[in-house]
Structure formats: structure tokens, C-alpha cells
């Protein structure tokens, strides 16, 4: 059962000093109560509220300091502070939080103020004196929530003003092994010109292993089997050695030079008595590009070639190249 607040015998008039003795039952410590009384708005002449000083073992004087009157009716609010640390250590902690109840003497002394509310918050007794006590400010009847308690001390108030909430740096995570958060650098955004250059200057993929020179022979008309000798010992390492990739034109020229070297080697082996035999593939160069279709050139190729006479034929009567008019003749 929570503590019951019992007041002294009610009096018809308000006490001059404004003291309200409060006691707790069941060995529960009750904190000090500071009550402010406000007149009812129905009275014609508002009376200045009386403030009761804190009741404790150290304060025994009953001097009351009247507060200036206000036009708006105030709600009676109790200022409660925890007991000293030495007293709290000697007494056991309560099992259940105390239930706030207004003193009956206060209700008997102010029966007319039906519209005013009584707010008597009880602070927990397990709190140390280092924490700032709740200082409640009397609010109007229209307010339904209490203001946030201010910071304790002027230094803390100045620190709160100088450093706002949004400027406060985030506290690192506490633990035995705090893991630092990796900072991800923003990815640089490429401009249009840089992106275009990257697309144009993109590296070509690595070419496959170059094929041997024998694979280039089908592009050129191949001679008979008798004309193609076996490769010599000097040419074998040249065929197997890897080379840089070449264009189609250079590969065709390599094939022509290879055939010429093969023909020369064959002529040397046959000797001068064997006679020279030039392969038909060496009479013309291979096509270095694909020819276009041309009808005029095809027509000229189909005509018979003109005959060239090496001996001039001389007639006995020379031919006259003079012209005569029509209807006239020479005598």
C-alpha cells in the first residue's frame, strides 16, 4: 500500500505561515512539499497567494514570502525535493511507488476552488542529490502538460544554449570492441566528355594465339603437292614462334614471300639442269581488297586484243587526204 498523506486538523481560515505538515505511513519517507495557493477566479478581489517554505529538519522558521498577484488563476503545485543521501541510505527503499494524494486540510481550506486542479508529484527517494530536482512552474488550467525541467546550474544552461541539438556530434557506440564505421568515399561522377573518351579509347580485347603460317595458304591458290617441299630446320622455329597479330594485307604478303622463298629453295635443290619452273600463283599478285563489279571493264576484257604489225605496208600510190566539195572533181 502506498504512503498516505495525512494533514493536521483543518482550520476554517488559512494558516498564517502556510505550513502543511505531511507524514508517511509504513516507514516510507515522504519528501518535502512546497505548496502554492491561488484564489478562485470567481472572487471579486484576488488575494495574493502565499508560499510555504520547505518543511524539514533544518528549516524551522515560518517566514512566508508573498508572491505578486497575477491576473490568471494559478494551479496549486507542490515542489517536492528528495531527502539527503545519508537519510536515504539508512532507510530501506519502498517496494511500490508512492501514490500522490492531496492533503485533506488543503481541500478543506479551499472548498470554493472547484475548477482548479491539485498536482502533487512525488519524486522518487532513490535519487541522489547530484541530479537536478524537478522544479515545477504553476501553469494555467488550459495547459495539460508540464514544462520540461531546466538544466541544473548556469554552466549547463550556457552549454545547452551554445551547442544546439542539431550541432551535437554523435556519440560513438560504447562496448568492449567498438567497431569504427567505415567512411565510404563518394564516387566521382564522370562528365559527358570523359565518358565519350573512355568509350572511344576502350582497349581492344587480347587477341588469341596467332595461327601458324600454313593456315594462310587457302587464301592464295595452292600449287600441286610436288611443288610444296617440306619445311627446313631453319624455318620450323620461325613458324612456331609467337608474333604480334597482323592485318589481313600483311598476312597475304607474308604468304607470297613464303612461296617465293620456297620456290627459290626448290630451284637450288634441283640444280641448273632441272630447268626453272615458276609456279602459276606467282604470276600475279593476290587481291589486296575485294574488287567491285564493273561492266565496262568486263566488256573490254571480252574483246579480242588488237594486233600489232611490226612491218609498215607501203602502197605505190599515196593516199590523197585533200577534201573536195560535193559535185566537184579534180582534173
Curated annotation (Swiss-Prot):
Start and end residues of each stretch annotated as Disordered: 1-112, 128-185, 204-247
Lineage per the UniProt record: Eukaryota, Metazoa, Chordata, Craniata, Vertebrata
Protein name: Proline-rich protein 33
Protein's organism: Homo sapiens (Human)
UniProt xrefs under InterPro entries: DUF4643
Composition-biased stretches (Low complexity): 149-169, 217-238
Superkingdom of the organism of origin: Eukaryota
Biased composition, class Pro residues, residue ranges: 94-105, 170-185
A Pfam short name: DUF4643
Amino acid at each position: 500500500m502506498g504512503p498516505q498523506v495525512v494533514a493536521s486538523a483543518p482550520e476554517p481560515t488559512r494558516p498564517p505561515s502556510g505550513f502543511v505538515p505531511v507524514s508517511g505511513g509504513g516507514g516510507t519517507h515522504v519528501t518535502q512539499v512546497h505548496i502554492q495557493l491561488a484564489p478562485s477566479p470567481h472572487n471579486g478581489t484576488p488575494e495574493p497567494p502565499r508560499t510555504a517554505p520547505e518543511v524539514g529538519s533544518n528549516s524551522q522558521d515560518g517566514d512566508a514570502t508573498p508572491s505578486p498577484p497575477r491576473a490568471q488563476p494559478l494551479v496549486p503545485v507542490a515542489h517536492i525535493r528528495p531527502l539527503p543521501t545519508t537519510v536515504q541510505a539508512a532507510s530501506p527503499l519502498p517496494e511500490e511507488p508512492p501514490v500522490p494524494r492531496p492533503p485533506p486540510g488543503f481541500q478543506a481550506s479551499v472548498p470554493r476552488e472547484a475548477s482548479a486542479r491539485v498536482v502533487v508529484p512525488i519524486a522518487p527517494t532513490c535519487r541522489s542529490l547530484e541530479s537536478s530536482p524537478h522544479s515545477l512552474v504553476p501553469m494555467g488550467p488550459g495547459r495539460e502538460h508540464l514544462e520540461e525541467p531546466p538544466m541544473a546550474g548556469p554552466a549547463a544552461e550556457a552549454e545547452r544554449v551554445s551547442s544546439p541539438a542539431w550541432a551535437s556530434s554523435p556519440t560513438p557506440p560504447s562496448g568492449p570492441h567498438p567497431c569504427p564505421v567505415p567512411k565510404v568515399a563518394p564516387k566521382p561522377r564522370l562528365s559527358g566528355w570523359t565518358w565519350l573518351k573512355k568509350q572511344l579509347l576502350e582497349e581492344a580485347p587480347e587477341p588469341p594465339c596467332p595461327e601458324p603460317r600454313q593456315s594462310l595458304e587457302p587464301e592464295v591458290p595452292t600449287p600441286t603437292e610436288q611443288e610444296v617441299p617440306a619445311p627446313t630446320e631453319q624455318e620450323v622455329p620461325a613458324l612456331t614462334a609467337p608474333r604480334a597479330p597482323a592485318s589481313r594485307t600483311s598476312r597475304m604478303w607474308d604468304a607470297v614471300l613464303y612461296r617465293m622463298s620456297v620456290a627459290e629453295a626448290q630451284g637450288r635443290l634441283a640444280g641448273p639442269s632441272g630447268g626453272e619452273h615458276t609456279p602459276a600463283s606467282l604470276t600475279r599478285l593476290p587481291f589486296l581488297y575485294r574488287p567491285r563489279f564493273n561492266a565496262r571493264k568486263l566488256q573490254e576484257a571480252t574483246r579480242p586484243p588488237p594486233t600489232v604489225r611490226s612491218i609498215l605496208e607501203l602502197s605505190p600510190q599515196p593516199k590523197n587526204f585533200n577534201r573536195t566539195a560535193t559535185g566537184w572533181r579534180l582534173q
